[in-house]
């Protein structure tokens, strides 16, 4: 499974991740988002999405390691991938049938969103 990780760029942006190369993804409090974090597996692909005024997918990353021994605070280390050649906006996703049943458009406050292969390809252009 692939995932989309939402972040407020003024707090932590994709550029920050690129500069640091890797980070522990934290600051998640929603119970569903925490469960999604805990389900992640090493090597899974991620899309980084900027919230706030941007509302767009901006880059890729990969899960490096997962420690879900504490389900209330899973520790997921991710490493930066590449910036997207063409960032995809929330409006683009909503206009596509690819996301009609996705939490990305149905649960706007969910910060860790599972993606199927088709959704991942739509966002990344791969």
Where do the PLM segments sit?
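Contiguous surface segments at macromolecular interaction interfaces
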Residues: 1-11, 29, 68-126
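Surface-exposed flexible segments
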Residues: 15-19, 62, 92-96
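Compositionally biased, charged N-terminal/linker segments
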Residues: 1-42
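Short beta-strand-centered aromatic/proline hotspots
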Residues: 56-67
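Short, charged beta-turn/beta-strand-edge "cap" motif at the junction between a beta-strand
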Residues: 49-55
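Hydrophobic/aromatic beta-strand segments within beta-rich folds
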Residues: 43-47, 112
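A generic structural signal for short beta-strands and their flanking turns/coil linkers
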Residues: 1, 21, 42-44, 57-59, ...
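Hydrophobic beta-strand signal
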Residues: 47-48, 62
């Amino acid at each position: 499974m692939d995932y989309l990780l939402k972040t407020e760029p003024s707090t932590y942006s994709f550029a920050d991740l690129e500069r640091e190369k890797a980070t522990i993804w934290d600051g998640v409090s929603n119970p569903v988002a925490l469960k999604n974090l805990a389900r992640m597996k090493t090597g899974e692909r991620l899309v980084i999405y900027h919230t706030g005024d941007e509302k767009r997918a901006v880059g890729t990353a990969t899960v490096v390691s997962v420690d879900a021994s504490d389900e209330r605070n899973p520790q997921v280390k991710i490493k930066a991938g590449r910036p997207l050649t063409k960032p995809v906006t929330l409006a683009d996703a909503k206009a596509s049938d690819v996301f009609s049943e996705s939490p990305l458009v149905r649960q706007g406050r969910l910060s860790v969103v599972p993606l199927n292969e088709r959704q991942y390809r739509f966002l990344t252009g791969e």
